[in-house]
Amino acid sequence: MTALPSPDRPRILVANDDGIFSPGIKALALALADVGDVVVVAPDVEQSAVGHGITIRRPLRFKHTASAGFGTLPAYRVDGTPADCVVLGVHLLGRPDLVVSGINLGSNLGDDLTHSGTVAAAIEGLALGLPSIAFSQQGNGGGEYSFTAGAAYAARLARAVLAKGLPPRVLLNVNFPAGLPRGVRITKVGEHRWEDSIITRHDPEGREYHWVAGQSRAADAHDPDTDYGAVQAGYVSVTPVRLDLTARDLLGELAGYVPEI
């Protein structure tokens, strides 16, 4: 039987991009159950790297599920994007006090933020006027992830954000290192980027198809002030991210050479 929400406890909406059956979202939701009344709304299949896409050309299915391992926590699966999950969760289940996304299988550092579905779910929460946090876990290189330390820290950080709040239009992007964290660093977004490569093959009928592959690169891998540098050094990276992407330092310079209409 689904536990009823308590009027004395904060409401927490948990989403992700790895899908509702991901071990990361299960670890996060169960840890946050000690903080508030948790409801899970996640994609029914993996939606990694879809960015902040919103589905507007077809209807969406929003279904309760009891088979994803969340125990008494209410959980819903959506045949849409991570941002869709937040939109539907907020509008169909009521406004939460906090939106949390993750824990992602793999880091979201530097330029990853621009295509991360995990971060996009937090951005959608922020766009709806709700404090939001995205959590991601670095892998050990062998395709394995440990969420114990990250989930415990996520609960502590959620308590702090619920108590103190966040500045308007600012979310937190949090990344956990593969091993036991050495500490926590407040960081800036680094220059960690993905260099694409295309693998071209042919199907049995000779028709060409392509895989987008690539390799991550970091221009500032040893800068301790960046998200990438902190995680590589074994620290939890907590990065405040603004929804406003304006390059304010260039406003005056552009006015000097942008032509009039």
Swiss-Prot record:
<keyword id="KW-0479">Metal-binding</keyword>
<dbReference type="GO" id="GO:0008254">
    <property type="term" value="F:3'-nucleotidase activity"/>
</dbReference>
<feature type="binding site">
    <location>
        <position position="18"/>
    </location>
    <ligand>
        <name>a divalent metal cation</name>
    </ligand>
</feature>
<feature type="binding site">
    <location>
        <position position="48"/>
    </location>
    <ligand>
        <name>a divalent metal cation</name>
    </ligand>
</feature>
<dbReference type="InterPro" id="IPR036523">
    <property type="entry name" value="SurE-like_sf"/>
</dbReference>
<keyword id="KW-0547">Nucleotide-binding</keyword>
<dbReference type="GO" id="GO:0046872">
    <property type="term" value="F:metal ion binding"/>
</dbReference>
<keyword id="KW-0378">Hydrolase</keyword>
<keyword id="KW-0963">Cytoplasm</keyword>
<dbReference type="GO" id="GO:0008253">
    <property type="term" value="F:5'-nucleotidase activity"/>
</dbReference>
<dbReference type="GO" id="GO:0004309">
    <property type="term" value="F:exopolyphosphatase activity"/>
</dbReference>
<dbReference type="GO" id="GO:0000166">
    <property type="term" value="F:nucleotide binding"/>
</dbReference>
<dbReference type="InterPro" id="IPR030048">
    <property type="entry name" value="SurE"/>
</dbReference>
<feature type="binding site">
    <location>
        <position position="104"/>
    </location>
    <ligand>
        <name>a divalent metal cation</name>
    </ligand>
</feature>
<comment type="similarity">
    <text>Belongs to the SurE nucleotidase family.</text>
</comment>
<dbReference type="InterPro" id="IPR002828">
    <property type="entry name" value="SurE-like_Pase/nucleotidase"/>
</dbReference>
<dbReference type="Pfam" id="PF01975">
    <property type="entry name" value="SurE"/>
</dbReference>
<comment type="function">
    <text>Nucleotidase that shows phosphatase activity on nucleoside 5'-monophosphates.</text>
</comment>
<feature type="binding site">
    <location>
        <position position="17"/>
    </location>
    <ligand>
        <name>a divalent metal cation</name>
    </ligand>
</feature>
<protein>
    <recommendedName>
        <fullName>5'-nucleotidase SurE</fullName>
        <ecNumber>3.1.3.5</ecNumber>
    </recommendedName>
</protein>
<dbReference type="GO" id="GO:0005737">
    <property type="term" value="C:cytoplasm"/>
</dbReference>
